[in-house]
Design a protein with these regions (language model features):
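Soluble non-cytosolic domains of exported or imported proteins
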Residues: 56-64, 76-84, 125-133, 150-154, ...
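Extracellularly exposed regions in secreted/surface proteins, prominently low-complexity, repeat-rich
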Residues: 165-186
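Short acidic/histidine-centered micro-motifs embedded in hydrophobic/aromatic stretches
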Residues: 88-92, 156-159, 163
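Extracytoplasmic/secreted envelope proteins and their assembly/folding machinery
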Residues: 63-70, 83-87, 113, 132-139, ...
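Export/targeting segments at the very N-terminus of extracytoplasmic proteins
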Residues: 46-91, 95, 183
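Peptidoglycan-targeting cell-wall enzymes and recognition modules
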Residues: 49-56, 94-153, 162
Length: 186
């Protein structure tokens, strides 16, 4: 250890000791009987939507699917943020339409609100075209993502979905947030 560094460290230690001798222990002046606990409510700010936002007008079927996603999220005991991520994911994957087999236009064997694939273990075609089942399956995957509550929506959705277009989910965050705000308590 060089001499200058050692002298500096000794000076800092000496000042810390001297401060304690002259000032005395600070906690000794406080009266623990008078101490009152202070409750502080802290609510994490909702993340701001990333990038340009898209919006579509929903028909009755799509609105029913929004409500089904919210109901499944509540049933799973998850917060509104999980519903926002789920709805944004479904907006990207199917525009909130419960898609069956699309023939030649289909991406492999992807089905339902989340374009889940039976061959990837999401469930049977009948299961993944059931909005409650497909949402619950998506939420099960979301729960396995460490820190999903605090990460950008597109990152959380992509970790579950493993899409060829990982950033595409972000464009639906504002509409998903608005839909959850509109239907969560209805």
């Amino acid at each position: 250890m060089n001499t200058i560094f050692r002298k500096s460290m000794l000076s800092v230690a000496g000042l810390a000791f001297a401060g304690g001798v002259f000032a005395g222990p600070i906690a000794a002046h406080a009266n623990p009987v008078d101490a009152k606990p202070v409750a502080v409510a802290v609510q994490a700010a909702a993340p701001k939507p990333q990038g340009d936002q898209s919006h579509i007008t929903l028909d009755d079927e799509q609105t029913a699917n929004v409500k089904a996603i919210i109901a499944a999220t509540k049933k799973a005991g998850l917060p509104e943020r999980a519903a926002v991520i789920s709805i944004a994911t479904s907006l990207q994957e199917s525009k909130l339409e419960n898609l069956g087999h699309l023939g030649d236009a289909n991406d492999h064997d992807s089905l339902g609100l989340f374009q889940q694939r039976p061959t990837s273990g999401w469930g049977t075609p009948e299961q993944i075209t059931n909005p409650e089942y497909s949402t619950t399956a998506f939420l099960k995957g979301l729960r396995q993502v460490d820190g999903w509550q605090d990460m950008p929506l597109t990152e959380a959705a992509q970790t579950v979905q493993v899409s060829a277009y990982p950033d595409a989910y972000a464009q639906w965050e504002q509409q998903a947030t608005d839909l959850v705000g509109q239907y969560w308590n209805s």
